[in-house]
């Protein structure tokens, strides 16, 4: 209707037999809902210049567009990133898993990634970004102005620091981390 998508379902398979599902529909409040599920997220992430050397993973994407503003969440589980900044590589050396990841050349492993962002016109505001892995965790926020400026601030934390912090909590630390 009026050159707008009101309902679309795409079920597809990559050449490696991994699934890709895309759903777009307009709800009763005239909000456009987009969902993507992919067992092969690399082709979907290749246009993001700040994500390089991505391998593996399963991607879930959910977006609601109201008027000209979209609020979105990307979740990715069980993946590796091969090209990371030098500081992140140094911090991964603080754990045995990080050393193993770097020595194999396969990249730094992450168990979970979540990105919550809002887009309007050419501005993407990153409300929350986190990636948690056995060697390092990353938390960020900021914004990306299309074809112009990227401003991100956040924290890189070696996993050993997180484990020590949790371990120092009486009783709870013994249960979660052990001795």
Predicted features along the sequence, with ranges:
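Solvent-exposed beta-strand/coil patches in large extracellular/periplasmic or lumenal scaffold regions
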Residues: 1-157
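Surface-exposed, gly/pro-biased binding rims or lids
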Residues: 157-179
